[in-house]
């Protein structure tokens, strides 16, 4: 059976929980057509998370890599178009805060996703979920992991990879107090629709 690697992150900064964990844990083991979803949670650590992703890829040998990240403050599901070869941001969970560093010293400046992001947002909107394409994944861990996934996809013909930012869950929004949120079941359903569109694009 063909495999999908679906990743999320542990809590970070002032977010006491991370709904990507709940989404990944809920969808882990699900089957969509001839694809099997395998979920993994990554550390919020610039060094460790990239190595973890590489180990998971080596173990699973996925044809599709979809990574999820929390975008606290956004109200829409936002598939990302591009990852850039820069890491620069607030401290990770081990206190490391890179400034103007390359993800890969000899790497390309940027990679465009090869996920069907236009089909994703069209499907989400048809189903009543707010969605739009994002043209920046930032320079924090989300961009870092998207870039690493796309490096693998570039090196392995037929592999598709990309990143989807999600809003907060209601639970997190209530805890935080200043960001919008969705019901966790809607976040799970929306991500599943994105996976379905990716599978459909690969089968046609």
From Swiss-Prot:
The keyword Cytoplasm applies. Pfam families: Peptidase_C15 (PF01470). It is an enzyme of class 3 (hydrolase). It comes from the Bacteria. GO terms for molecular function: pyroglutamyl-peptidase activity. The active site is at 80, 142, 165. It is found in: Cytoplasm. Keywords: Cytoplasm, Hydrolase, Protease, Thiol protease. InterPro entries: Peptidase_C15, Peptidase_C15-like, Peptidase_C15-like_sf, PGP-I_bact-type, PGPEP1_Glu_AS. One of its GO terms (biological process) is proteolysis. Its EC number is 3.4.19.3. One of its GO terms (cellular component) is cytosol. Its main location: cytoplasm. It catalyses: Release of an N-terminal pyroglutamyl group from a polypeptide, the second amino acid generally not being Pro. Removes 5-oxoproline from various penultimate amino acid residues except L-proline. Homotetramer. Belongs to the peptidase C15 family. This is Pyrrolidone-carboxylate peptidase. It comes from Lysinibacillus sphaericus (strain C3-41). The gene is pcp.
